[in-house]
A protein has these predicted regions:
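Intrinsically disordered, low-complexity basic tails and flexible linkers associated
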Residues: 1-170
Length: 170
């Protein structure tokens, strides 16, 4: 039985049926007294966190639930730097103050290390708030993959202007 078969009354589940097609339901926990459901899905391709949130919100509303949590569990080989926008969504929702430091950042994944290059400074703040560790935990839980996270500060306006001064001195 597929995810879309169980929650067939949800318009969002039908809208995003392709995202969940051929995936498996690993686990369903029902807490009747709290009207809460927890589902662990194993999709065959990564699914945007915004899709998961929209589907969960609709299921909660349509089925009159108090809460629903949808967890995703992917094959390790599906992880790449292309998943970074989903990591950003998770981190900025969990740590509201991190959004300004992560805005414009980019990621590369190679040899077991996810390297995040910030557009500005902010590495120290992100590290002191445990962002790197949270990313490791998220990837471990979703992909069964252990990785290292490296955060690199980007240029600031001061760096830019000092480079112009160096250029103008020639």
């Amino acid at each position: 039985m597929e995810f879309s078969d169980i929650f067939d009354k949800s318009a969002e589940v039908r809208n995003y049926a392709d995202c969940f097609k051929d995936g498996k339901i690993e686990n369903i926990k029902v807490f009747e007294a709290q009207k809460r459901i927890e589902i662990t899905l194993r999709p065959v391709k990564t699914v945007k966190k915004s899709v998961i949130m929209a589907v969960a919100k609709d299921i909660r509303s349509v089925y009159g639930l108090g809460a629903i949590k949808i967890f995703t569990h992917y094959e390790p080989e599906l992880f790449s730097a292309a998943y970074y926008p989903e990591i950003l969504t998770y981190i900025t929702l969990k740590f509201h103050g991190s959004a300004e430091f992560l805005e414009g950042s980019e990621a590369q994944y190679s040899d077991g290390t996810l390297t995040i290059t910030l557009a500005k400074k902010g590495k120290d703040m992100l590290i002191s708030n445990g962002i790197g560790e949270d990313i490791k935990k998220l990837v471990s839980e979703e992909f069964d993959l252990e990785l290292e996270v490296e955060i690199i500060d980007g240029e600031t306006d001061d760096d830019y202007f000092s480079n112009i001064d160096d250029y103008n001195s020639y």
